[in-house]
Amino acid sequence: GASGFTGRQTVRYFAENAPPGKVRWAITGRNQGKLEAVKRQVGGVAKDVDILVADSRDQTAVDAIVSRTRVMLTTAGPLALYGSAIVDACVRFKTHCVDITGETTWVRDLIDRYHNRAAADGTRIIPFCGFDSVPSDLGTYLIVRHLQRELSVPCKEV
């Protein structure tokens, strides 16, 4: 949510960079008090941003937010615990979803469960948009490069 380390940085970024009047955004999380504290800390444009409260374990509350959202950016982790309900709602409501996970097993499960429906509907589910994914991405890249250069093994897909 917006009250965690990455969430606070994201709120600050949007407050400082979102074009006024062109991008409508809100701060979301489980705890109203913590979200209000983030707004106060960030100040500026953030003071006028709506707060939407939902626990990701409450599918009805998640649905209420996602159903009125075009793009959901989630920074609450671990996403294997807190993100599945959000992605499920995003696919059902055709809301694009971006997350910061580095949890490859969870993402594999998401692909298996949601890719076909999301792709058919034009919904973008974009995981691995944070630093957590760098070690996995770099490790995968180095393994593929080694297989290709040292062992002459082609790699069509990872």
Residue map of PLM features:
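The conserved SAM/SAH-binding core of class I Rossmann-like methyltransferase domains
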Residues: 28, 75, 100
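Short, conserved SAM-binding/catalytic segment
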Residues: 38-47
